[in-house]
Protein backbone atom coordinates (compact mmCIF):
# COMPACT_ATOMS: atom_id res chain seq x y z
CA UNK A 1 0.00 0.00 0.00
CA UNK A 2 1.27 3.41 -0.92
CA UNK A 3 1.26 6.00 1.87
CA UNK A 4 1.19 9.29 -0.05
CA UNK A 5 1.32 11.45 3.09
CA UNK A 6 4.38 9.66 4.48
CA UNK A 7 6.18 9.83 1.12
CA UNK A 8 5.56 13.57 0.83
CA UNK A 9 6.71 14.24 4.39
CA UNK A 10 9.89 12.19 3.90
CA UNK A 11 10.61 14.11 0.69
CA UNK A 12 10.12 17.45 2.44
CA UNK A 13 7.03 18.24 0.37
CA UNK A 14 3.89 20.04 1.47
CA UNK A 15 1.35 17.49 2.70
CA UNK A 16 -2.25 18.69 3.08
CA UNK A 17 -4.86 17.00 5.22
CA UNK A 18 -8.43 17.51 6.30
CA UNK A 19 -10.31 16.48 9.44
CA UNK A 20 -13.49 14.44 9.26
CA UNK A 21 -16.02 14.44 12.08
CA UNK A 22 -19.55 14.59 10.70
CA UNK A 23 -19.48 13.06 7.22
CA UNK A 24 -20.40 9.39 7.04
CA UNK A 25 -20.00 8.79 3.31
CA UNK A 26 -17.25 6.64 1.84
CA UNK A 27 -17.07 9.13 -1.02
CA UNK A 28 -15.31 11.65 1.23
CA UNK A 29 -11.88 10.17 0.42
CA UNK A 30 -12.43 10.59 -3.30
CA UNK A 31 -13.81 14.10 -2.79
CA UNK A 32 -10.82 15.16 -0.67
CA UNK A 33 -8.28 13.54 -3.03
CA UNK A 34 -9.87 15.36 -5.98
CA UNK A 35 -9.66 18.58 -3.93
CA UNK A 36 -5.90 18.14 -3.56
CA UNK A 37 -5.63 16.70 -0.05
CA UNK A 38 -3.09 13.98 0.78
CA UNK A 39 -4.48 12.62 4.02
CA UNK A 40 -7.80 12.32 5.82
CA UNK A 41 -8.08 12.57 9.62
CA UNK A 42 -10.96 10.37 10.79
CA UNK A 43 -12.03 11.31 14.33
CA UNK A 44 -13.56 8.53 16.44
CA UNK A 45 -13.06 10.40 19.71
CA UNK A 46 -15.34 13.43 19.30
CA UNK A 47 -18.32 11.87 17.56
CA UNK A 48 -20.38 8.71 17.33
CA UNK A 49 -18.48 7.17 14.41
CA UNK A 50 -18.02 3.45 14.93
CA UNK A 51 -15.35 1.06 13.66
CA UNK A 52 -17.46 -0.06 10.69
CA UNK A 53 -17.82 3.46 9.28
CA UNK A 54 -14.17 4.34 10.01
CA UNK A 55 -13.12 1.14 8.25
CA UNK A 56 -15.25 1.77 5.17
CA UNK A 57 -13.98 5.35 4.89
CA UNK A 58 -10.36 4.21 5.39
CA UNK A 59 -10.53 1.58 2.66
CA UNK A 60 -12.26 3.96 0.24
CA UNK A 61 -9.72 6.70 1.04
CA UNK A 62 -6.83 4.35 0.24
CA UNK A 63 -8.51 3.42 -3.02
CA UNK A 64 -8.78 7.13 -3.86
CA UNK A 65 -5.08 7.67 -3.15
CA UNK A 66 -5.44 9.53 0.13
CA UNK A 67 -3.89 8.40 3.43
CA UNK A 68 -6.43 7.61 6.19
CA UNK A 69 -5.36 8.48 9.74
CA UNK A 70 -7.72 7.62 12.62
CA UNK A 71 -7.94 9.13 16.10
CA UNK A 72 -9.14 6.37 18.41
CA UNK A 73 -11.48 7.16 21.32
CA UNK A 74 -9.12 6.16 24.15
CA UNK A 75 -5.84 4.50 25.18
CA UNK A 76 -6.76 0.95 24.33
CA UNK A 77 -4.65 -1.51 22.40
CA UNK A 78 -7.69 -3.02 20.68
CA UNK A 79 -8.87 0.34 19.31
CA UNK A 80 -5.54 1.00 17.60
CA UNK A 81 -5.02 -2.49 16.21
CA UNK A 82 -8.57 -2.71 14.92
CA UNK A 83 -8.42 0.54 12.95
CA UNK A 84 -5.05 -0.48 11.50
CA UNK A 85 -6.44 -3.89 10.56
CA UNK A 86 -9.40 -2.13 8.94
CA UNK A 87 -7.40 0.16 6.66
CA UNK A 88 -6.04 3.10 8.66
CA UNK A 89 -2.46 3.97 7.80
CA UNK A 90 -1.87 5.93 10.98
CA UNK A 91 -3.29 6.15 14.50
CA UNK A 92 -3.63 9.16 16.79
CA UNK A 93 -4.17 8.53 20.49
CA UNK A 94 -5.95 11.30 22.41
CA UNK A 95 -4.56 13.03 25.50
CA UNK A 96 -0.95 11.80 25.40
CA UNK A 97 0.51 13.97 28.14
CA UNK A 98 4.04 12.64 28.62
CA UNK A 99 6.81 10.57 27.05
CA UNK A 100 6.11 7.48 29.17
CA UNK A 101 2.55 7.26 27.87
CA UNK A 102 3.78 7.82 24.31
CA UNK A 103 6.36 5.01 24.64
CA UNK A 104 3.72 2.64 25.99
CA UNK A 105 1.38 3.43 23.10
CA UNK A 106 4.15 2.91 20.54
CA UNK A 107 4.87 -0.48 22.12
CA UNK A 108 1.24 -1.45 21.51
CA UNK A 109 1.79 -1.11 17.79
CA UNK A 110 5.36 -2.34 17.35
CA UNK A 111 5.55 -5.51 15.31
CA UNK A 112 8.14 -8.21 15.80
CA UNK A 113 9.13 -9.60 12.42
CA UNK A 114 9.73 -13.35 12.45
Predicted features, each with a name:
Residues 16-20, 40-42, 68-71, 91-93:
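Hydrophobic faces of well-ordered beta-strands that scaffold small-molecule active sites
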Residues 100-110:
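C-terminal helical cap(s) of enzyme catalytic domains, especially alpha/beta-barrels
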Residues 28-29, 37-55:
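Glycine-rich, proline-tolerant flexible connector loops at the mouths of alpha/beta enzymes
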Residues 35-39, 85-90, 110:
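Glycine-enriched alpha-helix->loop->beta-strand junction motifs that scaffold or abut catalytic
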Residues 77-89, 100-101:
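Catalytic cores of alpha/beta
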Residues 112-114:
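Conserved small/polar residues in nucleotide/adenosyl-binding loops
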Residues 1-19:
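N-terminal amphipathic alpha-helix/helix-capping segment at the start of soluble metabolic enzymes
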Residues 21-33, 74-82:
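Short, acidic/polar
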Amino acid sequence: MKNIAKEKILNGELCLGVGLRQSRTVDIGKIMATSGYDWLFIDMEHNSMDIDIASQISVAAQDAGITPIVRVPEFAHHHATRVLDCGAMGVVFPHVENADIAKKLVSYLSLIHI
